[in-house]
A protein has these predicted regions:
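Hydrophobic alpha-helical connector segments
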Residues: 62, 76-102
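Short secondary-structure transition hinges
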Residues: 97-135
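Basic, helix-initiating cap at the start of DNA-binding domains
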Residues: 1-28, 33-41, 58
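Base-recognition residues in the alpha-helical recognition helix of bacterial helix-turn-helix
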Residues: 26, 50-54, 62, 66
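Short hydrophobic/aromatic patch on the recognition helix
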Residues: 21, 43-53
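Amphipathic, non-transmembrane alpha-helical scaffold segments
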Residues: 10, 18, 60, 64, ...
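Amphipathic alpha-helical packing segments from all-alpha helical-bundle domains
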Residues: 69, 76, 120-146
């Protein structure tokens, strides 16, 4: 049985790999990055890297999902706030701006990721994107109905 400490250590190693990969992707470009470079930047051997990820695409997808998860965790409280649509929309946009500013490398990666996504992974990206757009659209529509957003 795996104890909590071991689980935490595995998660920390995985996160360290993702941070190393993000740096290499940013420095060298996604297409030119190799698993060797990711392993080296994260401070692990290739065997450890392949224990956690079977391919560069898997690393890419996990970074993308981590970025979206961080964004959602940051704006979720604003989405459920019981305030008017105008204040809610402005609050979400401000929070997103703060999150993006605090981790520029992650979000430069995240916003350029669609250029590199394999066809098999496009739906994952699209799901996150559509969810964000749907929430923002519903807030705007509510604001228009309540006459908080006008021409």
């Amino acid at each position: 049985m795996i104890n909590n400490r071991k689980i935490e250590e595995r998660e920390e190693r995985k996160l360290r790999i993702l941070k190393g990969a993000l740096k290499v992707f940013s420095d060298s470009g996604i297409d030119k990055t190799t698993m060797d470079e990711i392993a080296s930047e994260s401070g692990f051997g290739k065997a450890t890297l392949y224990y956690y990820f079977s391919s560069k695409d898997d690393v890419f997808i996990d970074i993308m999902e981590l970025g979206w998860k961080q964004l959602w965790e940051g704006i979720e409280s604003r989405i459920v706030e019981n305030i008017g649509p105008r204040k809610k929309f402005i609050g979400i946009i401000k929070k997103m701006g703060k999150i993006v500013t605090e981790d520029k490398t992650m979000y430069e990666f995240l916003f350029t990721a669609p250029n590199y996504i394999q066809d098999t992974n496009k739906q994952t990206w699209k799901t996150y994107q559509e969810r964000l757009y749907a929430i923002l659209q519903s807030i705007i529509e509510e604001g228009i109905k309540k006459k908080e957003f006008v021409d």
